[in-house]
Swiss-Prot record:
It comes from the Bacteria. Its EC number is 1.1.1.290. It comes from Escherichia coli (strain ATCC 8739 / DSM 1576 / NBRC 3972 / NCIMB 8545 / WDCM 00012 / Crooks). Substrate binds at S45, T66, Y258. This is Erythronate-4-phosphate dehydrogenase. The gene is pdxB. PROSITE patterns: D_2_HYDROXYACID_DH_1, D_2_HYDROXYACID_DH_3. It is found in: Cytoplasm.
Length: 378
């Protein structure tokens, strides 16, 4: 049994070798010749999986180690009788922590308190729900918009996108990309929406590039609209609008979900799905794969205020480490993908062990996802 895996999927070689012969291949583009005798294909979001790639090939199963699936033609796979699995929620924690790292940086730079801001969350799936929970643990007001979930009657106080635009100080997008249909998200943030944002608002896109109309956004910024922008995703990736990058406050190369934990979850989820598909079901404990964190433990004295939270968050991950490299190489062919391929190891907040002498600080840090314990001062 021959299994092709994206060369940038961590732990894929070791895990899938339990099931068959593994060949690691680049994801963009997939070497077509390798598909001629392969039984399974494991990809990331950079690989377009469709009829033109797989027609006439012996592939029986496709797995994507990503939460999003807009790069996969699921309807064609089903029609062709090819098994499929994604990894929903695998990188949700990573994306939430990316948003926090960005907001805390902007808050420090611009001198505002996050506790005084209202955050509008567009898309309340695995990422949106976790973001809502962590913001509300801090007492930060959130507004939720998710028309598909609202129409299904899912639990939640869902509001219209227009209301979020009018009321939110921060608007952050966490939707799939739907190019048409009743829940179309292509250019959901169009020129009209962008111009309607509150003066001084923050706009964040960490889902799919085309959810925000990049041309319209650049037009608004060039005209002097007072707006802070965080973009991790771009229309036309791996190409991007260099002029737009110059205008945004934080720009990164589609790495919001790139924690080691998130990548490992993606790999293990598709591994478990494929093992079940072939009748040799196996399960993997994530902590058996991950290395020991580099931070060890730290001690925190007193309550948890915003500056202290910012220091803890940026100790684990400071978004500026990914902004600067992109600006240096933007516009050079191949460099966007190279930044992603050679991405420095990044961990989640749970890797940081915090000893607190304040019980409320320990409790709050645990709610936020840190590994915190309370030890009273002596």
């Amino acid at each position: 049994m021959k299994i092709l895996v994206d060369e940038n999927m961590p732990y894929a070689r070791d895990l899938f070798s339990r099931l068959g012969e593994v060949t690691a291949v680049p994801g963009r583009p997939i070497p077509v010749a390798q598909l001629a005798d392969a039984d399974a294909l494991m990809v990331r979001s950079v690989t377009k999986v469709n009829e033109s790639l797989l027609a006439g090939k012996p592939i029986k199963f496709v797995g994507t180690a990503t939460a999003g699936t807009d790069h996969v033609d699921e309807a064609w796979l089903k029609q062709a009788g090819i098994g499929f699995s994604a990894a929903p929620g695998c990188n949700a924690i990573a994306v939430v922590e990316y948003v926090f790292s960005s907001l805390l940086m902007l808050a420090e730079r611009d001198g505002f308190s996050l506790y005084d801001r209202t955050v509008g969350i567009v898309g309340v799936g695995n990422v949106g729900r976790r973001l809502q929970a962590r913001l509300e643990a801090l007492g930060i007001k959130t507004l939720l918009c998710d028309p598909p979930r609202a129409d299904r009657g899912d639990e939640g106080d869902f509001r219209s996108l227009d209301e979020l635009v009018q009321r939110a100080d921060i608007l952050t997008f966490h939707t799939p990309l739907f190019k048409d249909g009743p829940y179309k998200t292509l250019h959901l943030a169009d020129e009209k929406l962008i111009r309607s944002l509150k003066p001084g608002a923050i706009l964040i896109n960490a889902c799919r590039g085309a959810v925000v109309d990049n041309t319209a956004l650049l037009t608004c910024l060039n005209e002097g609209q007072k707006l802070s922008v965080v973009l991790d995703v771009w229309e036309g990736e791996p190409e991007l609008n260099v002029e737009l990058l110059k205008k945004v406050d934080i720009g990164t190369p589609h790495i919001a979900g790139y924690t080691l934990e998130g990548k490992a979850r993606g790999t293990t989820q598709v591994f478990e799905a494929y093992s079940k598909f072939i009748g040799h079901e196996q399960h993997v404990a994530l902590d058996t794969l991950l290395p020991a964190p580099e931070f060890g433990r730290i001690t925190l004295h007193g309550p948890l205020d915003q500056p202290t939270l910012k220091r803890l968050v940026h100790l684990v991950y400071d978004v500026r480490r990914d902004d600067a490299p992109l600006r240096k190489v933007a516009g050079i062919p191949g460099e966007f993908d190279k930044l992603r391929k050679n991405y420095l190891e990044r961990r989640e907040w749970s890797s940081l062990y915090v000893i607190c002498d304040d019980a409320s600080a320990a409790s709050l840090l645990c709610k936020l996802g840190f590994n915190a314990v309370h030890h009273p001062a002596r």
